[in-house]
């Protein structure tokens, strides 16, 4: 009879519990600090406020339209990008991956330059004698900006799902003569389906909680989201109770949607191998033309706003801005925050997924979803509420620190966790399903498994998740807006100061530098695993060692 006492908590569950406890405790502490610092307010009066319900309806409607307009075209664009190889494809994929985390002020500046009433398209229509009736303000402008930010990200996630389809499935389908709708339905759709709902839920939450985009392009109180209403409640009315109630409504809506998407998305068994650049033997000219049109339309959506930022940034004040020490101080501060936040984000995300995938493999899907839901809590928590809660919490306890580096790095790391979760969730689950039995038979666990199996098998997804987290942190403005000053400024904060002091030419140069920095950092991090790195390469060799 066995006498060895079993541990109360198995080892693989400890990382996820620690990470989930940390994230939930931080979010609740920030929320409660805001709630308890609010004066007594009649909650019933707030719930009966007609403007509150208008904001809620508009937030839902624009988020639904934004998610639908982002995900539906991304399905066809991802299939086109998977089938085609052309010069600049790698650069286009990097652009698709980083548009979501581009600094909002930079992207909105480019969108207005192209689609504004005095923009490039308006000038072109005027020369052609056509009336330009489109306005980039209001619901149309918000949807345009949200599609610009989110459709490329959805495309990248769906392309990753297509690349994970085992080559054996494609070969069997080709031998059976399966093509068109049947090929999509039986081969591609099962893999796309498990990524579509989580991606749509992520985009819905991003648009539901949109702040800077709606602030810039909303055009008035008729186009206001919950996050913007929270900002107004804190900045203009200083009504913390109203802000806390709005934040609670947003968290309930977003977390409910995430839980529903996780329940509906089905896991499928992993295949044997993947083949990059599959060539369909039944390819034809019509398919090539359709794919070419889709890729061209995507380029016409993405490139003009970025070109506008580049052209406006190359002005006569370029050299004088580069010679300013303040610019380089802000640049190095942004890099320090980005790298620190990115590494912390990846560590917490892997801890969450390490435990949640083991729960899923043991048929405890609900417990695994609960762990992952804790990581999505930060996305549901409005950034301005999180930052304000930290400010009040520190001010009422230990006092505000002299340097805001630690607060900004940790807050940005938490806010990047949902992005890293979406990138790493399926790859980590696939690796576990593929190598769990091998690791158990060879007694590879803990740090040894992390070193010899996970880090080798997940080189590319880890690099992509780190790139997302770093670029998102380098372009963040919401947290720095509370703690930034003349001694602590990042590039977005410096850009905000330039715009506020009506130095538009200097601001255009700073926006260009910020754009170049984001693209260079993303490219550098994505190249870290090596050009020929595969998701599962080297694992069998590592296990044999």
Regions found by a protein language model. Give the residues of each.
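Membrane-water interface segments at the C-terminal ends of transmembrane alpha-helices
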Residues: 7-41, 50-163, 191-216, 243-262, ...
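Short amphipathic alpha-helical coupling elements at transmembrane boundaries
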Residues: 45, 90-93, 126, 167-175, ...
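Membrane-helix interface/capping residues of multi-pass secondary transporters
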Residues: 52, 169, 178, 211, ...
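Short helix-to-coil transition segments within interhelical loops
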Residues: 163-192, 359, 437-458
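Peri-membrane helix termini and adjoining interfacial loops of integral membrane proteins
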Residues: 34-45, 116-128, 218-227, 268-275, ...
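Glycine-rich helix-loop "coupling/hinge" segments at transmembrane-helix boundaries
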Residues: 113, 212-238, 476-504, 538-541
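Flexible interhelical linker loops that connect adjacent transmembrane helices
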Residues: 264-294
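Short cytosolic juxtamembrane segments of multi-pass membrane proteins
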Residues: 270-281, 361-362, 528-545
């Amino acid at each position: 009879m066995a006498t060895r006492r079993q541990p109360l908590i198995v080892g693989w569950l400890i990382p996820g519990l620690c990470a989930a406890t940390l994230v939930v405790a931080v979010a609740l502490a920030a929320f409660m600090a805001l709630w308890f610092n609010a004066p007594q307010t009649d909650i019933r009066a707030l719930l009966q406020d007609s403007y509150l319900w208008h904001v809620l309806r508009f937030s839902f409607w624009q988020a639904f339209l934004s998610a639908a307009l982002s995900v539906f075209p991304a399905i066809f664009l991802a299939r086109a990008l998977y089938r085609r190889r052309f010069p600049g494809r790698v650069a286009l994929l990097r652009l698709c991956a980083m548009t979501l985390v581009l600094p909002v002020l930079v992207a909105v500046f480019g969108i207005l330059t192209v689609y504004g009433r005095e923009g490039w398209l308006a000038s072109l229509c005027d020369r052609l004698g056509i009336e330009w009736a489109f306005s980039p303000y209001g619901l149309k402008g918000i949807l345009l900006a949200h599609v610009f930010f989110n459709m490329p990200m959805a495309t990248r996630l769906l392309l990753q799902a297509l690349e994970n389809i085992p080559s054996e499935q494609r070969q069997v389908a080709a031998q059976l003569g399966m093509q068109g709708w049947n090929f999509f339905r039986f081969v591609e759709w099962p893999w796309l389906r498990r990524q579509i709902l989580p991606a749509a839920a992520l985009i819905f939450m991003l648009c539901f909680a949109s702040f800077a985009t709606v602030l810039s392009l909303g055009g008035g109180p008729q186009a206001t989201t919950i996050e913007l209403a929270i900002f107004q409640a804190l900045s203009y009315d200083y009504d913390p109770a109203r802000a806390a109630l709005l934040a609670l409504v947003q968290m309930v809506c977003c977390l409910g949607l995430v839980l529903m998407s996780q329940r509906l998305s089905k896991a499928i068994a992993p295949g044997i191998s993947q083949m990059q650049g599959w060539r369909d033997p039944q390819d034809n000219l019509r398919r090539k033309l359709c794919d070419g049109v889709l890729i061209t339309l995507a380029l016409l959506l993405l490139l003009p706003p970025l070109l506008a930022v580049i052209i406006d940034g190359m002005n006569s004040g370029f050299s004088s801005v580069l010679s300013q020490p303040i610019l380089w101080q802000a640049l190095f501060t942004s890099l320090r925050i980005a790298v620190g936040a990115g590494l912390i984000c990846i560590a917490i995300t892997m801890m969450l997924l390490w435990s949640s995938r083991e729960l899923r493999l043991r048929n405890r899907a609900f417990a695994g979803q609960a762990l992952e839901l804790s990581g999505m809590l930060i996305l549901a928590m409005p950034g301005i509420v999180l930052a304000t809660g930290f400010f009040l919490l520190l001010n009422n306890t230990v006092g505000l620190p002299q340097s805001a580096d630690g607060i900004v790095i940790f807050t940005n790391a938490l806010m990047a966790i949902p992005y890293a979760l979406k990138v790493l969730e399926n790859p980590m689950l696939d690796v576990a399903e593929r190598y769990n039995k091998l690791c158990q038979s060879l007694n590879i666990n803990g740090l040894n498994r992390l070193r010899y199996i996970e880090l080798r098998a997940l080189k590319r997804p880890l690099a992509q998740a780190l790139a997302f987290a770093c670029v998102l942190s380098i372009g963040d403005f919401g947290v720095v807006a509370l703690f930034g000053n003349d001694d602590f400024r990042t590039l977005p904060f410096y850009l905000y100061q330039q715009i506020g002091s009506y130095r538009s030419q200097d601001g255009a140069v700073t926006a260009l530098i910020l754009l170049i920095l984001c693209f260079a950092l993303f490219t550098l991090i994505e190249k870290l695993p090596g050009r020929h790195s595969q998701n599962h390469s080297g694992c069998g060799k590592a296990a044999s060692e």
